[in-house]
Curated annotation (Swiss-Prot):
InterPro entries: Protohaem_IX_farnesylTrfase (IPR006369), UbiA_prenyltransferase (IPR000537), UbiA_prenylTrfase_CS (IPR030470), UbiA_sf (IPR044878). Keywords: Cell inner membrane, Cell membrane, Heme biosynthesis, Membrane, Transferase, Transmembrane, Transmembrane helix. It comes from Vibrio campbellii (strain ATCC BAA-1116). The chain crosses the membrane at residues 8-28, 36-56, 85-105, 108-128, 131-151, 152-172, 211-231, 269-289. Its EC number is 2.5.1.141. The lineage of its organism: Bacteria, Pseudomonadati, Pseudomonadota, Gammaproteobacteria, Vibrionales. This is Protoheme IX farnesyltransferase 1. One of its GO terms (biological process) is heme O biosynthetic process. Pathway: Porphyrin-containing compound metabolism; heme O biosynthesis; heme O from protoheme: step 1/1.
């Protein structure tokens, strides 16, 4: 039973988001005092709130999930978990995560994570995902909140750098999500989800993805230009952004779009891990680098 309740929190999504939380935290910690305990508390708090959002998403997406091969065996679709119990579970996760951030980290982090939760649950899950081709864009707003909360956990104020970080992860979400939609396009068609590749076609989605990847690279380098990140960050971010751009700009059609979109997706993960990793490493004094 414990395994079933764990599965509806979508641990993979939580882990991916916590990497971006750490990225924001590490970036802020370059100029503000921080501690490992603060990082751990922030990760736990944000993780609980994300888990709650994923549970609610599972509850409301039962009708969609049963139409998709990838999701038709989820616990709530199969009736293995009571819906009312899942709602209570989501509420407990949300209250504990928010309270932890509010009391131990700072109130601003708690407020921002709640705003992200509202966007994900009420705007994205309940409406835009089902009814609009712009659902991915709305979802990108909530998806960019975790790194922002990581940053605010250290600074407790919104700065130009924090705003740039938020915009950067909004931009990252778009080609990342479109890539997923492309290699799972039949599932999205079966469920009637109006994502851009399904509604407007592969060529249109490809154009959008190229634009977002380029914009992401510009903003990523912008963090260095503001003096918030070091030369190690510049080298790594430039390298991963170049690789992501190179893959994204490859020719794509109906014969190779599945393989191509999987490559774009994998590169998007490498980009986040590379940027997050180098921001963490820059906090460590390395005499042979500095």
């Amino acid at each position: 039973m414990l395994k079933r309740y764990l599965s509806i929190t979508k641990p993979g999504i939580i882990f991916g988001n916590l990497i971006s939380v750490a990225a924001g935290f590490f970036l802020a910690a370059k100029s503000e005092p921080a501690s490992f305990l603060l990082l751990l508390t922030t990760l736990v708090g944000v993780g609980l709130v994300i888990a709650s959002g994923c549970v609610v998403n599972n509850i409301f997406d039962r009708d969609i999930d049963q139409k998709m091969k990838r999701t038709q065996n989820r616990e709530l679709v199969m009736g293995n978990i009571n819906t009312d119990a899942a709602f209570v579970y989501a509420l407990v996760l949300l209250l504990n995560g928010t309270a932890l951030l509010f009391q131990v980290v700072n109130p601003l982090s708690a407020v921002v994570v709640l705003l992200g939760y509202v966007f994900y649950v009420f705007f994205y899950t309940m409406w835009y995902k089902r009814n609009s081709v712009y659902g991915t864009l709305v979802g990108s707003i909530s998806g960019a909140v975790p790194p922002l909360v990581g940053y605010l956990a250290v600074t407790n104020y919104i700065s130009l750098e924090a705003t740039l970080l938020f915009v950067m992860f909004c931009l990252w979400q778009m080609p990342h999500s479109y890539a997923i939609a492309m290699f799972r396009m039949q599932d999205y068609r079966d469920a009637g989800i109006p994502v851009l590749p399904v509604k407007e076609g592969i060529a249109k989605a490809h154009q959008h993805m190229k634009a977002y990847v380029v914009a992401f690279g510009v903003v990523a380098i912008g963090l260095f230009m503001l003096g918030e990140a070091g030369y190690e960050y510049l080298a790594v971010s430039a390298a991963v952004c170049f690789m992501w751009t190179r893959v994204t700009f490859q020719k794509v059609d109906y014969n190779n779009y599945i393989q191509w979109s999987k490559s774009v997706f994998k590169m998007s993960l490498l980009v986040v891990m590379g940027i997050s990793g180098v921001l963490g490493l820059e906090l460590i004094p390395l005499p042979f680098i500095h």
